[in-house]
Design a protein with these regions (language model features):
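Charged, amphipathic alpha-helical segments
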Residues: 22-31
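Short, mixed-charge low-complexity intrinsically disordered segments
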Residues: 35-57
């Protein structure tokens, strides 16, 4: 079972950890909703560090 980390980009351009999920669809939905509400870029990264997706607000 893969772990997916949700990260967001702060005002200085540094990626910060937000939370981890095991379901990719749920992770995308959470990141997408939070990107829209906060106006910050979010990304999904798997446990190997592979970039899965970047969500723009």
């Amino acid at each position: 079972m893969t772990k997916i980390d949700i990260q967001y980009q702060d005002q200085f351009g540094k990626w910060r950890h937000l939370q981890s999920k095991h379901n990719e669809g749920d992770a995308y939905r959470s990141a997408s909703n939070r990107a829209r509400s906060t106006g910050k870029r979010h990304r999904l990264v798997d446990q190997d560090g592979t970039l899965l997706d970047v969500i723009e607000p």
